[in-house]
C-alpha cells in the first residue's frame, strides 16, 4: 500500500524514477557493516507493486545482498527484480573489480548503478572504465562532502588556535559565492514582489 501510494504520488509530481531497496528499516549506508535485508518475496513485491502502479516512473531496484549473503544471492535477487519489472539494477557494494565485471557480464543491456564511496567496500575505478563495463550511472555520494569536511576542519582548527584562516588559501571569492547561490535572482525577485505591492 505504501509503495503504491508513494509511486503514484511521485508519478503525479513528474518524478522520472524511484529507488526501491531490500534493506530493513532503519537502513544503513551500503558501505557500512551490520546491514540486514528483507526476504526476497517482500522485496520483489515492492518492485511488482511499483510497476503495476505506473509505467511512467523508472524503477531502480537496489539490493544489499552482497554484504549479507554474498554475490550469488545478490545476482539472484537482481534477476528476480528484473522479472518483476525493474528498469535499472543497483547491486550495492561489490567488493572487487571481479565482482563489478561479473555483474556487468550478467546484466548486459540492463542499466546498472555503481556507488563509489571513498574508503568504502567497492574499488574506485575510473568512470569511463565503469561505462565500458556497462554501468550507466555512477554515484559519488560523498566525494565533495569528504573534501569540504577536511577544509572545514582546517579552517576551524586555525580559528580555535587563535589565528585566522589563510586569506590566500584556495577558496571561492565572496562575490562568486553569492552568484553561485543565486543572490542576484533572489534580489530581482524581491524587487519584483516589492513593486507589485506598491
Give a label for each model feature.
Residues 1-157, 192-198:
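Alpha/beta enzyme core
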Residues 145-198:
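Extended, intrinsically disordered, low-complexity segments
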